[in-house]
Structures are given as structure tokens and as C-alpha cells.
A protein has these predicted regions:
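Active-site-lining helix/loop region of Rossmann-like oxidoreductase modules
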Residues: 1-6
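Small-residue-enriched segments and motifs
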Residues: 103-104, 130
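Beta-strand/loop substructures that line and gate deep hydrophobic ligand-binding cavities in soluble
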Residues: 118-168, 177
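Hydrophobic ligand-binding cavity/cleft-lining segments
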Residues: 8-83, 186-187
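Secreted/surface-exposed cysteine- and glycine-rich disulfide frameworks
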Residues: 80-99
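Short, hydrophobic/aromatic-rich segments at coil-to-beta transitions
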Residues: 108-116
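Hydrophobic pocket/interface hotspot
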Residues: 48-53, 105, 142-144, 177
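Short, highly charged C-terminal tails/helix-capping segments
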Residues: 178-187
């Protein structure tokens, strides 16, 4: 009964460790996730940051180091994955189940959290999560975290090979989103 409830997507709680959806609905994928991320503070309100976060993908791409995102997409396409699939249902609005390029929206709490499931071919299952926290005084913290549930030794090797790039990309990406939110609010 618990697995059926989890598969239906109607689970009321949120957790990352062992979450069936975050493991690509596979039992053979690691229960405990590896994770990497970055954060930045924007001198603007949560709504301005949320608008940039929900605009990710499609024509906007990923705001930072798009050449590396494109390289990963091409690598995925070469092994038969959806890596070069780009686009989204709507340029600024997201809802559960939407596809954003090769990601799927699996969690959304307006102005607080956006959770995307990784859709490329890889030895494991991944999730990219954006969390927004209002700090008061017109400041907002954006935190981006990638969770990776490896499948076997290849999944671990894949994760550890990409950790340096992930740290670089996620720190830069959160800073780029924060600066963009500030510019959009003031402009």
C-alpha cells in the first residue's frame, strides 16, 4: 500500500533519502543520495527569484555555462538519450509533470521550492532542486542542490567524475539567477 501511494505521487511529505520518485521509480538505485550544490543571496524578494527559477530551460537555457550543459546534452544524445530535446509547455509557468528540456517537474511549491527529475541516460537517478528562502530586508537566498542516487559502481564513478563540474556550475548558476532576478526587478 505504501509503495502504491508513493507511485501515485500523492505522498504528502517531502524527503530526499529513499524517495521512490527521486530514484527514478527503481528499486535497484541507491537509497541514500550523493549531493552537491551552491547558493547565492539576491537583493530582491522571493517572487523575483522564483520568476527566474521557473523560467529555467527552453530558450533561457540554464543562465550559466550553457556550453557545459550543451556538451552533456550532446553526450546523452550520442547514447540514445533525450539530451538534445529542448523546450517547455509554457515559457514562464510550470506545473507538476511538465517537461523542461530533459527534466520533469516532480515538485513545486510557489516561491519556495522547485524539484526537477533528471531525464538523461545515466547509471542512476538524479534530481535538481531549487529552494528559495526569504531573509527579510528585501534579501532572498537561493539554494540549488543536485541529488544523485547511483546505480552500482558505474553510478558512483559517474557521480565522482562530475563533482568538480557540479560545484563550479551550481555556484555560478545560483549567482547568475540571483543577479538576473535583481536586474529584472530593478529594470
Amino acid at each position: 500500500a505504501a509503495i502504491a501511494t508513493e507511485r501515485s505521487g500523492k505522498v504528502a511529505v517531502r524527503w530526499t533519502e529513499g524517495n521512490f520518485a527521486m530514484r527514478g521509480s527503481r528499486h535497484d538505485v541507491a537509497y541514500y543520495a550523493k549531493h552537491a550544490g551552491g547558493s547565492a543571496v539576491a537583493n530582491t524578494d522571493a517572487q523575483a527569484v522564483w520568476e527566474q527559477v521557473t523560467g529555467i530551460g527552453g530558450r533561457n537555457r540554464y543562465y550559466y555555462m550553457n556550453v557545459l550543459w550543451t556538451l552533456r546534452e550532446v553526450m546523452d544524445w550520442c547514447v540514445g538519450g533525450p539530451g538534445l530535446t529542448r523546450g517547455r509547455r509554457h515559457p514562464t509557468e510550470l506545473r507538476l509533470g511538465d517537461t523542461v528540456d530533459y527534466w520533469t517537474v516532480i515538485g513545486i511549491e510557489p516561491q519556495r521550492r522547485l524539484t526537477l527529475s533528471f531525464g538523461m541516460r545515466a547509471p542512476g537517478a538524479g534530481v535538481l532542486e531549487f529552494e528559495i528562502e526569504s531573509l527579510g530586508d528585501g534579501r532572498t537566498r537561493l539554494t540549488e542542490t543536485a541529488y544523485w542516487h547511483p546505480r552500482g559502481v558505474w553510478g558512483l564513478l559517474y557521480w565522482y567524475a562530475l563533482v568538480p563540474a557540479h560545484l563550479f556550475i551550481f555556484r555560478g548558476m545560483t549567482s547568475a539567477i540571483a543577479r538576473r532576478a535583481e536586474r529584472c526587478e530593478s529594470g
